[in-house]
Amino acid sequence: KCNPAGGTVGGCRGVDRRHWISECKAKQSYVRALTMDSDKIVG
């Protein structure tokens, strides 16, 4: 079930590859937004 090419990367899991990709992208964008906001506040 876990494929090195597109299995569980970064702790992202999904029913299928499409759902898995969408979940990963959503999480990455959310984390990036938080990091950008924190950088702006600090800087």
Swiss-Prot record:
Q: Which GO terms describe its biological process?
A: cell surface receptor protein tyrosine kinase signaling pathway; modulation of chemical synaptic transmission; negative regulation of neuron apoptotic process; nerve development; nerve growth factor signaling pathway; neuron projection morphogenesis; oogenesis
Q: Which UniProt keywords apply?
A: Developmental protein, Differentiation, Growth factor, Oogenesis
User: Where is the secretion signal located?
Assistant: none
Q: Which InterPro entries match?
A: Cystine-knot_cytokine, Nerve_growth_factor-like, Nerve_growth_factor-rel, Nerve_growth_factor_CS
Q: Which domain of life is it from?
A: Eukaryota
For molecular function, the Gene Ontology terms on record are: growth factor activity; nerve growth factor receptor binding
The protein's matches in SMART domains, at most eight in alphabetical order, are given as: NGF
Q: List the disulfide bonds.
A: none
PANTHER family noted in UniProt: NERVE GROWTH FACTOR NGF -RELATED, NEUROTROPHIN-4
Q: Which family does it belong to?
A: Belongs to the NGF-beta family.
Q: What job does this protein perform?
A: NT-4 could play a role in oogenesis and/or early embryogenesis. NT-4 interacts with the low affinity NGF receptor and elicits neurite outgrowth from explanted dorsal root ganglia with no and lower activity in sympathetic and nodose ganglia, respectively.
What's this protein's name?
Neurotrophin-4
Name of the gene encoding the protein in the UniProt record: NTF4
